[in-house]
Amino acid sequence: MIEKLQVIEEKYLELEKKISDPEIISQPQEWQKLMKEHSNLQPIVEKFREYKRILDTIKEAEELLDTDLDEDFEKLVKEELNRAKEQKEIVETQLKILLLPKDPNDEKNVIMEIRAGAGGEEAALFAAELFRMYSRYAERKNWKVEVMSTSESDLDGFKEVIFMISGKGAYSRLKYESGVHRVQRVPVTESGGRIHTSTATVAVLPEVEDVEVEIREEDLEIDTFRAGGAGGQHVNKTESAVRIVHKPTGIVVTCQDERSQHANRDRAMKILRARLYDYYQSIQQKEIESQRRSQVGTGDRSERIRTYNFPQGRVTDHRIGLTLYKLEQILDGELDEIIDALITHFQTERLKEIG
């Protein structure tokens, strides 16, 4: 590991020289590319330098203990040595995590799809609350939220909502939200005051560039129809709504929220591209997973990942056994505590797999 880190540090120093070279600065594209590479290596190099400082501290303390010391000073040196050894183990693990292969999608924007599951109107209201939760989280991160498609229920819930979140590292933080979210509470539609369980399914897809997925025109069946609002309001007089069927996979995308057919088609294609990318990736993933046997907690859509219990004010993430009594704060977008714990868990699992 040390040799690998030394090579990375040398590369980092080389990049440092290049990005301050006037000739490179005069080539914006090249300079930007090198800057990105430099900032990707920075956290590893900084952690490696911290690690080297700890090794120096250990060496100095051990050398001191080989000399004649008075009792009090020896005790202090031993304490410092123990602290440094503990710190060395922590930083070693952090370095191993930093050296893990990066998910190529981590820096991408995300397309999120939330669908009401079991529970009728109550599930649709819960889907709307999840949409608000992710929107508030995006606000906290200074990310941008753009609604792409909605299907509303009678009580202003969502049967389905598709939206894009754009911002640095959006996919790296939100990818663990894929799966079935469950709510336990007394529904507004329930007069008897009994607790009901409803569900909503969340899918998190990285935004995909045109070049990453090839879509052939002959594989598409495109229909247009008149868009209609909830309860027949704002009915469009022209056929601006678009439905696209990808014949080879059977994936269907409908968009009707935009005023023009052209804008709805663009949005539908963006969603289709992301779904196809996800579809082909999941086929690939299944092949890999069948060779490995650790299929728990990887964001399978059919897997129940989290429960939001209103009577107890509790949120439990079942994949990592984490329970927090912070329901209100979490639904208001304070998701970092859960997401950080999930990232740590899955990174540790990957370290075990690598061995």
UniProtKB/Swiss-Prot annotation:
Keyword Protein biosynthesis: yes
Its job: Peptide chain release factor 1 directs the termination of translation in response to the peptide chain termination codons UAG and UAA.
Annotated positions of the N5-methylglutamine modification: 233
GO cellular component: cytoplasm
Gene3D superfamilies from the UniProt entry: 3.30.160.20, 3.30.70.1660, 6.10.140.1950
Subcellular location: Cytoplasm
Assigned protein family: Belongs to the prokaryotic/mitochondrial release factor family.
Keyword entries, A-Z: Cytoplasm, Methylation, Protein biosynthesis
UniProt keyword Cytoplasm, yes or no: yes
Membrane spanning stretches: none
InterPro entries noted in UniProt: PCRF, Pep_chain_release_fac_I, Pep_chain_release_fac_I_sf, Prokaryotic/Mito_RF, RF-1
Name this protein carries in UniProt: Peptide chain release factor 1
Gene Ontology terms for molecular function: translation release factor activity, codon specific
Organism, as annotated: Caldicellulosiruptor bescii (strain ATCC BAA-1888 / DSM 6725 / KCTC 15123 / Z-1320)
Pfam families: PCRF, RF-1
PTMs per UniProt: Methylated by PrmC. Methylation increases the termination efficiency of RF1.
SUPFAM superfamilies in the cross-refs: Release factor
